[in-house]
Amino acid sequence: MTALSLQQQLAESIYTALGTAFEAGQLGQLTQLPPRQSVVVEKPKVPEHGDYATPVAMSLAKPCRLAPLAIAEAIASYLASDEIGVEVAKPGFINLRLGHRFVAVELQNILELKGDYGRTVPQQPERILLEFVSANPTGPLHLGHGRWAALGSSLERILQFAGYTVDSEFYINDAGNQMQLLGLSLKQRYLQVLGEAVELPDGGYKGSYLKELAEQLVADKGDSLGGEPVEWFSAYAEGRLLEQQKITLQQFRTEFDRWYSERSLHCAGAIEAALADLEARGMLYRAARSRQEQSGEITGRSKKVQAPAAFEEEDGGGEALFFKAADFGDEMDRVVKRADGNTTYLAADIAYHWDKYQRGYGRLINIWGADHHGYVPRMKAVAQALGHPADSLEILIGQMVRLFKTNPETGQKEEMRMSKRRGELVSVDDLIEEVGVDAGRWFLLSQSLNTTVNFDLDLAQSEKFDNPVFYVQYNHARCCSILRKAPERGMPILERFEFLKPDGGLWLETPQERTLALRLLAAPDEYRFAAVDRTPQRLTQYAYDLASDVSQFYEHCPILPPLAENLEPALRYARLGLVVATRQVLATTLTLLGIEPRESM
């Protein structure tokens, strides 16, 4: 386990030097030290400016009433050591260069910690419930579900690696009109297979997967099910389709700690319990219209949004039960129970999140599609109304996935909306069949969540270096190949490698060696930022950059005989140790992304 990441170590050293300068009276009119988190350490865009830098002196110029350069020089005078080289640059940057011993010790840490290198302890440990995918059990999972699966499962691994306690959950949307419609659609398909001239219901499910289910029913049961109620067909379809979703997700390396049925909320009385909790807190009221409608506050746009909920729930002029969502920033209050006594979808969502908090989770993270964006304010309001901070509920909104493939006739990239095999929307199963799990996950993870993924099928299928996942896996396999060949050529893999020369210099002197070493040392920070910022895509970029460094190192720095037989054995072994460390960090990074670190290609 890495106690502190590299940037955290540097920030601590800078803060200590800052405190020493303050105690020595060298920081002008500064009356108290700033908080530790105010010390920012970043990588300069220009390598000549050092390995890392901090602009902290510039942020202190106003309270110190000193020039940033003078502040930087005061801090730097207490910061320089054998392990860190320090220089001050205008207008007040403190540039840091890692010393030979510092680099050698960190590389040895990688070799000793192996797969635990970069595993950290958060400053504020939390128990997190991560909910994602949560599809209706009414059909195969589409590409959007695949994106949430890749993102959620990677984020779970990354958060756990960063020291958080994380459970994952799939919310099964198995209560509502769609389940009745699913059962009716399957029953009609069943009757059609038996030769009856019946039509699918309006708005029914028309996918070929239901026809296949119906054909299987006829094969297993013959014509004996015609008298069964729609509910029987609903339950059968749900069971089969949910099981297929589980198989698909498992193949896509996505597992859940719990599958939570929406229907169970109704059966266990959770909805009434949650509403009773809100009512006891004064968060509900009964009225024919919301407070905003009564006062005329609702604008034309807002009224249009609210009307289907508000008026529909009145049922002939009775009083509905409203949640005071507007008290917490939502644009209006929301109906949770209609005048006829039936609860709304929002009531079930309130109960589900109430139950999450009841189970002791301090932070809830939901991954939703862009079509749920408007639902965020009311759920944030729910969290606050239940007595929790607004930021205890994080809702990550993701954009759609578009699939492109070259048309062999025109040579142009064209968007694929339908699966050629099934004549339906492309599913996660189709994606796995086309490009495999590794490429599928990589390309779905490689973009920011709020960016549409333009998935290039041709590129994902390519076994050339222009395919980023192939390139990264190839360079991991290249490291494995070197490590397999080394003992055969008289260089056994050691438990400990010596990276320092007797005079204190570093054996790894070339630009390619230093670049690769520093990239490895950045891994704990990359993992930490990916966890804190909820950005798994950061690790795809890191893995690609690391693979590029491996390629440059391999090209310019021979390791094994006969190419390296004229080099000093100590240099060859230092390079071999660097390969061992590189393979480990690449493997860890790919594993966190749910991608196989392949040992051969």
UniProtKB/Swiss-Prot annotation:
Sequence motif 'HIGH' region, location on chain: 135-145
EC numbers: 6.1.1.19
Keywords of this entry: Aminoacyl-tRNA synthetase, ATP-binding, Cytoplasm, Ligase, Nucleotide-binding, Protein biosynthesis
EC class name: ligase
GO cellular component terms attached to this protein's record: cytoplasm
GO MF annotations in UniProt: arginine-tRNA ligase activity; ATP binding
Main subcellular localisation: cytoplasm
Catalytic activities: tRNA(Arg) + L-arginine + ATP = L-arginyl-tRNA(Arg) + AMP + diphosphate
Gene Ontology biological process terms in this record: arginyl-tRNA aminoacylation
Cell location: Cytoplasm
Family, per entry: Belongs to the class-I aminoacyl-tRNA synthetase family.
Subunit (UniProt): Monomer.
HAMAP family according to UniProt: Arg_tRNA_synth
Name the UniProt record assigns to this protein: Arginine--tRNA ligase
Organism encoding this protein: Gloeobacter violaceus (strain ATCC 29082 / PCC 7421)
Encoding gene (name): argS
